[in-house]
Amino acid sequence: MRIAMHLPLLLLYIFLLPLSGANNTDAAHEVIATNTNNWAVLVSTSRFWFNYRHMANVLSMYRTVKRLGIPDSQIILMLSDDVACNSRNLFPGSVFNNKDHAIDLYGDSVEVDYRGYEVTVENFIRLLTDRWTEDHPKSKRLLTDENSNIFIYMTGHGGDDFLKFQDAEEIASEDIADAFQQMYEKKRYNEIFFMIDTCQANTMYSKFYSPNILAVGSSEMDESSYSHHSDVEIGVAVIDRFTYYCLDFLEQIDKNSTLTLQDLFDSFTFEKIHSHVGVRTDLFDRNPSEVLITDFFANVQNVIPDDSKPLSVSHYHHYKDHIDTAQYELNNNVLDLALETYRKNNQSSKIEKKIKDIKSTSVLDVDIDSNECFFTSFKQSATIILALIVTILWFMLRGNTAKATYDLYTN
């Protein structure tokens, strides 16, 4: 008899149990990321005052990834660093990417890892492949692993299948391709997003052959990449067109943005860039329309790697932020109604406590920043409502039975 009396409570508890984040394994698998850390390698390969725009290009990207949460410990910045304190700089100690001088790119705790003559082809290849001596500082190493997404941005002067370094040497597209293959063999990345802004930029990714690499370049073979505008006070161009319009798009991005890399690619037009932007996707497992910009430009926090689902942590935050709040309210109202029903029928305080315990462990009160992520569905809501109906019907039946029993003993 006691079991029958508490049967509805047991049913209600069983139906609500899947709403607990700790037990909703299906939902958790859908949002666990394949990458646990994001890195950025930002390289300006030129030097001298008249290449001011290249330093502004790379510092602009540096500012963007820092704004979106990637820490300096996961950013490798390589640049000549000969502009801010150049004697021709009318604004000593400052670098601007726009003639309105709205943002000082050099004034926000810039940490340069490789400067001046340290920016060499050898150091760049060693950085990617991690071929250093034991005494090389960790702060100047790319300490990635098989769960790392890496954004690599390069700017400077280039040609057909080559990019000049410091106007003294060149790196070929085959060199970068082979370095990426070594990274793949050594399990140094999960995915790579390669972006290059230079003349004939698209030729620099033509030799890539390693998996999980997405590449974009500012110009086709035999095309130049152009500067956007000059500053009459500084006396030179302050940013390139491709990077300018990249930044124009990225300024609307925050850490929770749902915009994708395809959205970024679609924003490039010949009228804006004055050259044909190229995108290479054949080595990449995902469609760019499924790759959030924050998968590469923002930081990753509180994730567990899982090879079974190729979803990034950005998808995780995206889904969490867009869970239907009305669904939460419905579940909450159902539990409140069930509790009120128990109270009206003079049930014990233990039963009331049990319902409160269910609420405290359900989706309604979960910490939105926890590692557990789950989704409530209409099917689950229907199950809760069904359990409530069964409970109410049982109380109605029990009430009639109790009255009949009372009449039997009193008459």
From Swiss-Prot:
Residues 1-22 form the signal peptide. Its EC number is 3.-.-.-. The chain crosses the membrane at residues 377-397. Glycans are attached at N256, N346. Residues 23-376 are lumenal. Changing H54A: Partial loss of activity. GO terms for biological process: attachment of GPI anchor to protein; fungal-type cell wall organization; GPI anchor biosynthetic process; proteolysis. Coiled coil: none annotated. Changing C199A: Loss of activity. It holds the Pfam family Peptidase_C13. One of its GO terms (molecular function) is GPI-anchor transamidase activity. It comes from the Eukaryota. Changing C85A: No loss of activity. GO terms for cellular component: endoplasmic reticulum; endoplasmic reticulum membrane; GPI-anchor transamidase complex. Pathway: Glycolipid biosynthesis; glycosylphosphatidylinositol-anchor biosynthesis. Residues 398-411 are cytoplasmic. InterPro entries: GPI_transamidase, Peptidase_C13. It is found in: Endoplasmic reticulum membrane. The active site is at H157, C199. The keyword Disulfide bond applies. Mediates GPI anchoring in the endoplasmic reticulum, by replacing a protein's C-terminal GPI attachment signal peptide with a pre-assembled GPI. During this transamidation reaction, the GPI transamidase forms a carbonyl intermediate with the substrate protein. Forms a complex with CDC91, GPI16, GPI17 and GAA1. Belongs to the peptidase C13 family. PANTHER family: GPI-ANCHOR TRANSAMIDASE (PTHR48067:SF1). Present with 1560 molecules/cell in log phase SD medium. This is GPI-anchor transamidase.
